Structures are given as C-alpha cells and as structure tokens.
Amino acid sequence: MLFLLFLLVAPIYAGLILPTKPSNDPFYNAPAGFEKAAVGEILQSRKTPKPITGVFVPVKIQNSWQLLVRSEDSFGNPNVIVTTVMEPFNADPSKLASYQVFEDSAKADCAPSYALQFGSDVTTIATQVETYLLAPLLDQGYYVVSPDYEGPKSTFTVGKQSGQAVLNSIRAALKSGKITNLAEDAKVVMWGYSGGSLASGWAAALQPNYAPELGGNLLGAALGGFVTNITATAEATDGTVFAGIMANALGGVANEYPEFKQILQNDTDKQSVFDQFDNHCLADGVINYIGKHFLSGTNKIFKSGWNILKNPTISKIVEDNGLVYQKQLVPKIPILIYHGAIDQIVPIVNVKKTYQNWCDAGIASLEFSEDATNGHITETIVGAPVALTWIINRFNGKQTVSGCQHVKRTSNFEYPNIPPSILNYFKAALNILIQKGLGPDIQKDQVNPDGLKKIPILV
C-alpha cells in the first residue's frame, strides 16, 4: 500500500522541486551590451525550467519557453523583460493570444514567468489560478504569450512601461519562429483583466506610434475590469478588505518614480509599513493589509491623507499613468471592453469616460459589454466567455462592430453566441467561487475577511 502511495505521490513531489525565483535566477539579468539591441529583440531563450502550472498539477501542453527581451521603461531607458510562450498540442502557428495576467504586485518574485511555473510560491496563487483563463485559449490551438510587463523594477500600475513591454513581448514572440515555430506573420489578439487590462489597454493605445508595424498582426484587444484611473481604485479600496491592492500600487509607482517614493517617505512616520509595499504578491498583499487606511481615517499611514494628491509631482505622475487622461492616445485596432456595473474595486465611471473619449476621437471599432449584476471579482469569471467569444470571432475573421456600441446586460453570461462548452466551463467556475465561503454578496465585491484569509487553500 505504501509503495502504491509512493508511486502516486512521487511524480507530484518531483514536480515540486521549486523553480528558481527571479531575484536569484541569472536568466533575468540583462547581458552585457543589451542596450544596443532593438526593442523587441530576443536576447536569450530557454525552455521553462518547470511545466506551466495548473495550480495542483502541471498543464499538459506541447511546449513552453521563456524569452529574455529588450524593452524600455517609462523614460526610454533600456531594460529587459522575460516573456513566456506556450504552445498547445496541434497548435496553429498563425494565431497568437497575448494574455496579460493581473500580477498586481511590486515584487520581482511575483513575475508571471515565475508564477506560471508549477511549484511556484503560494503567494503567486492569483496568477496560478489564471491558468483557468489561459486553458480555453490553448484549447483553441492558439499559441499564448504572457509577458512580465511590469519590467525588472516591478512597476505595478505604471502605464507606459507596461504597454511597451506587452508590445515588445509580441514583437519577440513573432520573431521566435526558429525556437517556437510560431509564424512571423501570425495574427495576434491581446487580453487582460484588471491589472492585466491596464497593461493591455496601454499597449493598444501606444501601438499606433510605438509599434506601428504590428498593425498588420493585431486583430484587437479584450479589456475586462478595465483600469483607466489608478486614483479611483485607491479611493475605492482604501480601508477595505482590498486595501492591499492600493499598497502594492503605491509600491509599484514608487519603483518607477524615485521622486514619488521620496514624497511618500517624507509624509509618513510609519516607515516600516511603507518599506513592505514592494514585498508582497497580490494574494498575500491583500491578506496582509485587510482594512488598512493609507490616506483616510484617524490612523492613516500618510499624514497628508488625500491632500497628498494635490502635490504637483504626485498629481502629474498619477495623471501620466491613467488612460482616462490620455485623450491623445486612441487605439487603431478593434477593442472590446467588459466591466461590472457594481464593481467596487475599479469603479465603472472611469471606464465610461475612457469609452467616451475614444468614441469622441473616432475610434473605428469599440464594443462595451456592461454587466449589471457583477462586481470586480465575479466579473473575472462571468466576463471571460465574452472575451473568449470575441477573441474566437476575431481569429475566425468575423466582423466587429462599426464605431461604438455600449450594451448593458443583466449578466455577461447573456452575451450572444457564446460557445456552450465555454459558457458551461465558466458557470461551473462561478459556482465553485460562490461556494467557497468568501461571503454571500461576493457578486457585489462584499467579501468576508475571514474567507479572504483562506484564499491559498480555497483553490
């Protein structure tokens, strides 16, 4: 009996020899002279050290690689990113989905290229669970690329760094044919939810000027739980069970802007708390800061409270990283937006403003599918069939909407022509989530803190 148990457990145990974290992995280091390479150039490559994770078991796919890619930060300074390319069985080398995870962290060891590997730390559980969203893309036979778009400084919520990294990741993937067998002229669709939508949205908006040559490859972008104003998310989450998202965001912006970091440091007498903002992944960050007040209340971390946003330096940085303020940046590719009307983490008001900005600017194709009964958490699942249906239609050459179209449905499960297998897949996922003890009002983003603390063992 013990021998049989060993036979069952041994393969799993072998898989749990942990992958090396980015902070200790030389592959992530920029090689000498990398600055001379063009953006999007592959500097080195390797098979992923571990298989792609399915949380408890590896995902069975044909192959996966990591590419070290030349990119640049918000100021045009050269840097490198790692991107992960996944090849399913019976892959179609003419189709590539660029999936941006909601990393939502200011810590290097939370990078998707590490988190997507089987055996990665439990603190990366949010990214690990996102393989549930990746699976239908792979099942369609699409190659999938997922970049470490926050870059080597882990600049969570920094728009330009993120968008440029996504585009340079796509450039690299399209040049990787000798490694991956992906066609250089492959068609590409981008997809991201929440923090991943921020990166995807910035990529779509920057593409006409930053990567115009990709215009012939890109078929569109699906943006869910669309983050266009980081201040609004801070206001919505401060002092709530999701305050950790705000802490991670402050850490991410501080990683890119030293002057931002200095102003925050000078405004707190709780330096030990501030010093930990870049030391959490999404799940442990949320759990660690439940109910914490950073800019509100009598025991806030920053003495100036919300008045700190009136500081001209802070105000400019915040606006520079909010798509809602960038009226001059308008995508030229078709766009799908899906969002929950009762989202308590990313308020829909700024999504509507961005939608209107793009419509007023004459965007060629913008579809907005608004869900009346779901908030940020459950829309991750309920909105996914919308994105997948739209993506499949894009790859199959079906026509997108002409101009702007905004439709509000009771639930995005009602989106037209969702393939039954995809709809059933995500309905089952929603039922599992609701039954996991996070609270009876989870669809309204009202989460039981005790249930939230169980996240690592819920999945």
Swiss-Prot record:
<keyword id="KW-0442">Lipid degradation</keyword>
<feature type="signal peptide">
    <location>
        <begin position="1"/>
        <end position="14"/>
    </location>
</feature>
<dbReference type="GO" id="GO:0016042">
    <property type="term" value="P:lipid catabolic process"/>
</dbReference>
<dbReference type="InterPro" id="IPR029058">
    <property type="entry name" value="AB_hydrolase_fold"/>
</dbReference>
<dbReference type="Pfam" id="PF03583">
    <property type="entry name" value="LIP"/>
</dbReference>
<comment type="function">
    <text>Secreted lipase that is able to hydrolyze both the neutral triacylglycerols and the monopalmitate ester Tween 40, allowing the use of hydrolyzed products as carbon sources. Has broad lipolytic activity, which may be important for colonization and subsequent infection, therefore contributing to the persistence and virulence in human tissue.</text>
</comment>
<keyword id="KW-1015">Disulfide bond</keyword>
<dbReference type="GO" id="GO:0016298">
    <property type="term" value="F:lipase activity"/>
</dbReference>
<feature type="glycosylation site" description="N-linked (GlcNAc...) asparagine">
    <location>
        <position position="266"/>
    </location>
</feature>
<feature type="glycosylation site" description="N-linked (GlcNAc...) asparagine">
    <location>
        <position position="229"/>
    </location>
</feature>
<feature type="active site" description="Charge relay system">
    <location>
        <position position="194"/>
    </location>
</feature>
<feature type="active site" description="Charge relay system">
    <location>
        <position position="376"/>
    </location>
</feature>
<keyword id="KW-0732">Signal</keyword>
<keyword id="KW-0443">Lipid metabolism</keyword>
<feature type="disulfide bond">
    <location>
        <begin position="110"/>
        <end position="281"/>
    </location>
</feature>
<protein>
    <recommendedName>
        <fullName>Lipase 4</fullName>
        <ecNumber>3.1.1.3</ecNumber>
    </recommendedName>
</protein>
<feature type="disulfide bond">
    <location>
        <begin position="359"/>
        <end position="404"/>
    </location>
</feature>
<keyword id="KW-0378">Hydrolase</keyword>
<dbReference type="GO" id="GO:0004806">
    <property type="term" value="F:triacylglycerol lipase activity"/>
</dbReference>
<dbReference type="GO" id="GO:0005576">
    <property type="term" value="C:extracellular region"/>
</dbReference>
<dbReference type="InterPro" id="IPR005152">
    <property type="entry name" value="Lipase_secreted"/>
</dbReference>
<comment type="similarity">
    <text>Belongs to the AB hydrolase superfamily. Lipase family. Class Lip subfamily.</text>
</comment>
<feature type="active site" description="Charge relay system">
    <location>
        <position position="343"/>
    </location>
</feature>
<keyword id="KW-0843">Virulence</keyword>
<keyword id="KW-0325">Glycoprotein</keyword>
<keyword id="KW-0964">Secreted</keyword>
